[in-house]
Each structure stands twice: as structure tokens, then as C-alpha cells.
Amino acid sequence: MDIKYVSTRGDKEKVTASQAILSGIAPDGGLYVPETFPKLDKSLEELKGLNYREIAYEVMKLFLTDFTKEELKACIDSAYDSKFDTEEIVPMKEADGLTYLELFHGPTLAFKDMALSILPYLMVTSAKKNNLKEKIIILTATSGDTGKAALTGFADVEGTGIIVFYPKDGVSPFQRQQMVTEKGKNTSVVAIEGNFDDAQNGVKAIFSDKELAAELKEKGYVFSSANSINIGRLVPQIVYYVYAYVKMIEEGKLNLGDLLDVCVPTGNFGNILAASFAKELGLPLGKLICASNTNKVLFDFFKTGTYDRDREFTLTISPSMDILISSNLERLIYRLCDCDAAKNAKFMSELVNEGRYTIDRTMAGKLTDFEAGFATEEDTLNTIKEVFDKTGYVIDTHTAVAAFVANEYRNKNTSHNKILIASTASPFKFAGSVLTALEYDKVDGFTSEWDKIRELERISGKKLPETARDIENAKVIHKDICAKDEMKALVKEKILK
């Protein structure tokens, strides 16, 4: 089946996968979605025994239909190699009745590596397929993890440049150090005075500026995105849910056809949307449990049908989820509207102009695949300690949000489905908060982030990977700070300097 992509907001033009990857976002500001949805063309039985790269090919070929077999396999083999610290790519661990899918074994210790390791190869291949002559400028907003993963993926990739914006006070010390020490000659990192939503809105505004796009194209540049608004980010994330299910069958933890519930710590809605797409492919997933922190805009949406961004924004110990405008939810809303782009566009307009929208009863009735919960800061810290005390397994703050919500769901329901937790980051990325959970009386004695990491190594018996250890004494290269309304001018300056 030849899959074409359409905008969630009604742009009539149908584009290929490679064109959608290059554009990042549709000309009308919508997000690209498959016009028709494929199904797995191999049975789960046939997928048994395949490694991660092989399953990645079987899943991604269904969506990226204008890539040849050779092109797609080359992208996959280049992405999922020795830069991951385990041959499995995504190992699974059992702890206290839950199965943790460890998505943090890539170079930047976060799940974003799963997609951002392959996106540069997909993009360069797409550029060749479409005879693109211009240099691709990747614009990315980050709440912490996407930034470094994108920088690592695109560093010194020929024909590309990348500019990352992050909230000055909204990332962990480790995340900041990862970004500001990036050595790639085609990279720029900028702190903005604002939160992640300000950074994301600024990037979207730049993408939507047709005058700026025309000016830069004339000078040989085009924009694209490494955020999960890019379909090239979303498709690789579907893979690990299929892989996890197949491995659980192989290990006797599931019988073929058993429903598997999935609980995902959620900010921008991309990771859980990928699980939804996996279910649509035919994977036997049960409930998709959306886990929020105290910025619980998604929890409230699933409970009330109203998405309301007009609320207090809180900086939490799970900063990658500190988001009030969850971009990928638009792709779900579009499907709830029966792909009525005009209806979806109206909701998105209401969100911009009024700060909220409410879906109708028919749409709300289609949300039965989803459950939602949230964890307070206290819940998050207590969960880290409880899991460690019971099992010796250390989880990070975002994963702890999901574990708390999964346990809450399990205790309230009679379902006997196994629950898979998307474990999205290494605990070393948030060592201070994890230590606070494990050793209340000692954490204040460690003045540097690296002392905290060494203490966490001692407690957990795990070692920080060498690739991450290198940044401790690395030189800070990127020192730019700008106001949120200065982003466009700064982008022009950096590109045309």
C-alpha cells in the first residue's frame, strides 16, 4: 500500500513520507498524518526471533512507502548500532509486578534517542529523494531531552544545521550541561526566558512565517523540525512497542493475543500516540494509560473532554513533562473528528484564541482506549523509594510518575493485563531528585551534580555510561540567552551570519 500524508488542518495536498519528513509541519500549520492506516503485514508469530533492527524495518516500511528497502535498511542500520550501550537496544526489566521498557540506552540517556538517532538519516535520504538543494535548518524546542538527542543526531551532518531552544530555568543541570557543551560545528543552543510552551510556540511561529521562509529559501535554506510534530520522529517510536510485545511472547510473559496495557509518562503526547498507532497496526494493546505530573492538562482533558491551557504552570522534578500545550494531541483529535480537518482546525483555533476547547460527546465516546492519571511531587519521590526498597531497581522521576499511575490504575481495576511502563530516561539525568527520594538526609551535602551522580552510582550499583561522563569537564560552548519574542530575529542572525 502506498501511504500518502495529509495535514490535520485541511491542506488538500497529499505528500509522500519523505516530503512530510522534510517539511516537518504542513504549510497550514497542521501536522502530517497517514491518509490511510496500514496494518502489520507479518503476524506476530513471524516477528518472533527478529532483532530490534529487523522489527524496525517491518514496522517502518509500512509508513515510509516511498523509501526503497535498501534506503530504509541503511537508515536503520546506521541508527541502531554501537551508539547504544546494549545489543538489545531496548532491554526490559521486571520490578514489583510491572515491566519496564528501558528506552534510555542511547547516547543521551533518554527515549528521544530512539527516534532522533534515525531522523538525520531519514532526512538526508529524503533530501536526496526530492533533489533538495537547500541546506536544511532544524529548529527544535526542548523541555530537556529532545535538545541533546537532536544535537547528537544532527551534529556535523552534511547539508544540515540545527538550532535548539530550551527554557532557561526549565531543564535539569545534567540536561543543560549536555546541550551547552555540544561541539558540532553546525549546532546552536539558545536558552529562552520562558517555559517550554513559549519555546515551542516560538518555533511554530517561525515555521508558519511564509515571508521568512521565502527569504531564506532565496538564500539557500529551508526549515524542518526534529520535534515530535515531525512524522519522522513519530514512526520510529511505534517500533519499540511492537518489539516489546514480541519479546514478551518469546520470553513466555505473554501468550499470543494477550492484551498488554501500556503506561507512558506524557508531556507532548508523542510517545503515547506512537503506542496508539501501534495498536492501530494490529498490536494487541489494551489500555493506553496517560501519566501526567502536576501540570495535568492531559489528565483533565481525558476526564472532562475540555483541553484548557489557561492554568498555572509548575516547574517539577519531571521537567520533560512540564508542558501545557501538548502538540501531538492534535493528531488524536483529528482522528476523533473522523478526519474532519475543518473541525480539528476550529478546535486548534479555539486553543490559540481562547485558551481551551471542548470535544463533543461523540468524540469523547471514542476515547475508550485511554485511561489517565497524575502524580504529585510527593507521589513521584515516594514511588522511586518504594520501587528501590522493594526491588533494588532505580527509576528516574518521569518513569516514577508512570509507575505511580500504573499502580493506581492496577489497584482500582480488576483487569489482569500485564502493564508495560515506558521508562523514558536514565536516573542519572535527574540524580539530585532521585537522591532526594532515596536519601533525604544526605542530598544537601552534595554541591555538584557530578557528586550526586557518583553517589547514585554507589547506591544503585550502576555506572554512568562513558559517553555521558565526558561532559563533566567539557567546555561550555553555547551561552546565548534570548527573550521569547526575539527568537525569530536570532534565528535569522544565526543562519545568515
Feature locations, PLM:
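PLP-dependent amino-acid enzyme catalytic core
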Residues: 1-497
